[in-house]
Amino acid sequence: MKPSALTLPGYKVNEYLLVLNPHEELRNKIKEVKKEFHDVYKAPTALHGKPHIALVNFLQYAMMEERIINRLKTVAMGFYPFKVELKDFGSFPSHTIFINVTTKEPVRNLVKEMRPFQQLMKLNNDNKPHFIDEPHFTVARKLLPWQYEKGWLEYSQKHFTGRFIADSMLLLRRQAGIPDQPYQILQRLEFMNLPVTTKQGELFG
């Protein structure tokens, strides 16, 4: 994402990505799938990025960071750890191949929890937060037509299974407008399944 015009000169803009991160064994298993796809179809995006489920992607001024983290902490405090099941492959024609998440509802419910404060994630009218309502693990994106067609012909028949317990989400950050810059972990937000009254007491007590 690149910030469009209408940003305040002199103020730093960052790109943020909120994700669910699987355990190391599953991460390595997905990395192997991505590497195999790259070796056969020469798709550079298959090697980019760590395996995760993206929840929301947005641009915002660095000075807003603390307020955003506080709101995300509130969401995480009230949310419960849940099981994420992966099975086989899916695609977004005609550019992306991914690993299916079959337990979509808890992920969608989590994304829904963040919509009420989307104004905090809105840089300006041209840069609004992008909520990901179709949870998945990307194998490769931005594919050329031949890569997609041949790749999907193969991967639509392939099998994959995996599962993990999502007990937290990670807020990642990188400076906006710098291509191919890797994200850094900014904050881990643990799901605590606390009642609302406890949350408010802890935040404002």
Task: Spell out what each predicted region is.
Residues 1-83, 104-168, 180-205:
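Basic, often amphipathic N-terminal segments
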